[in-house]
């Protein structure tokens, strides 16, 4: 670049910083420019691996959607617990008015320090979310759920009144305001969403999510969570087998999927994941129903091995570290760009 262009560029950069503040524009090589994306664990080792960066990206919008009782809130509560372990502050905007503090505590959430809001309208919920994000003091905000963000006009109107597109407009406007603040404050904002059926779809997937298309575009990560089976002990059902598909990922290659167990009253079975991934990576040997570790039998059947790992936390931690070393991305590994990894018509 010749000297005149350099001077013109420096003058323009100086003018921008003077008008909009320091850090409003910078070179990617400058100290303080964000290149590596911070992440927070989902509480599931397999899902952290599938996401490619070791968890959910901070400073981004994430959407988690699925049918009823599929594990959406459980997954977000695990993410809150992991953020609190890192010393972060968490907020839960409970538009559904259905948060169970006893269950949250069982999953490891510090409920005494969890900020909770139960707003009356969708506008109020999104204004509260925006205020929390702009404060820069909250590390993770959960909105549960998009379907429950009822516009004020609908609440104040009569039953049977038509309010076509109100919720979609509300979400679109809110996300335009939120996105820049989310990036600037490095806050992770997770929207939980529900599934609806499109009427008259003959071919293709009739499923869609509520709240219009804005959230699909603004989300850096979209997770589709489904219950695929039950975990039984005799006739008693202990939990659900769950599958999560990464349907959109702007920070790593998408379309990976992972399966794990959610146990009632306990949340994601970390020991179960360590067993499955340990067998896959040949750290645990499996012969018939018997499992062995370093040549020694550790149990017959998955339930017994799960209990063995609970009773022997040292072995559990060793296995977890070995699995992470093998499967987690290395810090200097090349990362894909947002443009290359944007969604390719999966909605």
Swiss-Prot record:
SMART domains: AAA (SM00382). SUPFAM superfamilies: P-loop containing nucleoside triphosphate hydrolases (SSF52540), RecA protein, C-terminal domain (SSF54752). Pfam families: RecA, RecA_C. Its main location: cytoplasm. The keyword tRNA-binding does not apply. It is found in: Cytoplasm. Belongs to the RecA family. This is Protein RecA. It comes from Hydrogenovibrio crunogenus (strain DSM 25203 / XCL-2).
């Amino acid at each position: 670049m010749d000297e005149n262009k350099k001077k013109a560029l420096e003058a323009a950069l100086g003018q921008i910083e003077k008008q909009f503040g320091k850090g409003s524009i910078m070179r990617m090589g400058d100290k303080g420019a964000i290149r590596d994306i911070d992440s927070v664990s989902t509480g599931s080792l397999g899902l952290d691996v599938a996401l490619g960066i070791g968890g959910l990206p901070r400073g981004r919008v994430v959407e988690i959607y699925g049918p009823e009782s599929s594990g959406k809130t459980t997954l977000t509560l695990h993410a809150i617990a992991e953020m609190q372990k890192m010393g972060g502050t968490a907020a839960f905007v409970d538009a559904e008015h259905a948060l169970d503090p006893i269950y949250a505590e069982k999953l490891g959430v510090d409920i005494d320090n969890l900020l909770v809001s139960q707003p009356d309208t969708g506008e109020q919920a999104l204004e509260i979310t925006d205020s929390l994000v702009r404060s820069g003091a909250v590390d993770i905000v959960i909105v549960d759920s998009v379907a429950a963000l009822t516009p004020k006009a609908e609440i104040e109107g009569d039953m049977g009144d038509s309010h076509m597109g109100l919720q979609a407009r509300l979400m679109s406007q809110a996300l335009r305001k939120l996105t820049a603040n989310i990036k600037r404050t490095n806050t992770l904002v997770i929207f939980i969403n529900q599934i609806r059926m499109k009427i008259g779809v003959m071919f293709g997937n009739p499923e869609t999510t509520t709240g219009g298309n804005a959230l699909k575009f603004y989300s850096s990560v979209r997770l589709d969570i489904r219950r695929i089976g039950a975990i039984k002990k005799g006739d008693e059902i202990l939990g659900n087998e769950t599958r999560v598909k990464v349907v959109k990922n702007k920070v790593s290659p998408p379309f990976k999927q992972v399966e794990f167990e959610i146990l009632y009253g306990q949340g994601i079975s970390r020991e179960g994941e360590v067993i499955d991934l340990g067998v896959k990576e040949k750290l645990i040997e499996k012969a018939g129903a018997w499992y062995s570790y370093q040549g020694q039998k550790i149990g017959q059947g998955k339930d017994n091995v799960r209990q063995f790992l609970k009773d022997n936390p040292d072995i559990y931690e060793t296995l977890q570290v070995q699995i992470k070393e093998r499967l987690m991305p290395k810090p200097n590994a090349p990362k894909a760009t947002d443009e290359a990894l944007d969604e390719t018509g999966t909605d």
